[in-house]
């Protein structure tokens, strides 16, 4: 009898359904968050909210199905609470990106303080991407591509790093939290406008938890070829006065780390495979091994010169910020030494390290056109 009553009780629990369900049309889904510093006293929070009701009403149109909520306050949590008074409950489980205005982290407020609330909040995805922009974040969020919200456009643009070397890999909130905990210098992709369109154009260096300097897309390319994961892209060069394009298929790198007489030495070898995708030389003969070898040597020489110059002259001597991951190699191979020097790594050790960069290039293919004879 007791077993029968217990079974009936369990059945009633199963029939009760989902007690905490929410009607999706009544929800406000935050897909993008922006932070600005409009004055010396306050921060400004911009939330791009995807409203299902607007999607239903504007189905088939090219209108942006989002709303912007803008709130001022002294802390991020305070602004979040104030924003909650203006709207129906918002949910950040679908947050795609966090956009920081340079003004927020270029002064005295450390980036660890700015993202502290997001890291602590269980409702914020640590996989959300983080970007920096020069102007107001609301100006970025106000842009849309034929009805596609800016947050989605920017998120999709991160896929371009597979086809261009000038765009760095996206950086997540969780990865930034790890960098800040370790006091590392690191890069964050930069978002801006180009010809009226949203674009990921370059990156920003974060050093000592503050914005330190912007990098151009070409400088990002140099870092990618030195230490990044290069999945594809095109390198334009000249040979005998004629342009040609080398398309990267795959790439890998190997690093050897040594320490002697108070100085670190790194031997970085970059192996690249690709194809001769375009050649403006009217006398080219891609069927000749000697011609292909000369193309390989030209690419090797150019990549070696540009990357070495940027790393040794600008990154080590001028910027003095290790955004290449070499410090992590020291941490792995010389853990006890790293504990003693980690806080002085950028200025005292990385800037004086000896770096030997080597490049091996292979042309695996030259397309469907060979010599036209």
Swiss-Prot record:
InterPro entries: Spore_GerAC-like, Spore_GerAC-like_C, Spore_GerAC_C_sf
Keyword check for Transit peptide: no
Entry's family note: Belongs to the GerABKC lipoprotein family.
Signal sequence residues: 1-17
Domain of life, source organism: Bacteria
Localization (cell): Cell membrane
The protein's name in its UniProt record: Spore germination protein A3
Lipid-substituted positions (S-diacylglycerol cysteine): 18
Main subcellular localisation: membrane
Keyword Lipoprotein attributed: yes
Any Pfam family matching the protein: Spore_GerAC
Lipidation (N-palmitoyl cysteine): 18
A GO CC term assigned to this protein in UniProt: plasma membrane
Described purpose of this protein according to its UniProt entry: Forms a complex at the inner spore membrane which acts as a receptor for L-alanine, thus is involved in the stimulation of germination in response to alanine. Can stimulate germination in the absence of GerD and GerK gene products (fructose and glucose receptors, respectively), but the response is improved in their presence.
Membrane topology per record: Lipid-anchor
Regions annotated as coiled coil: none
Lineage start: Bacteria, Bacillati, Bacillota, Bacilli, Bacillales
Any single GO BP term: spore germination
Keywords, comma-separated and alphabetical: Cell membrane, Germination, Lipoprotein, Membrane, Palmitate, Signal
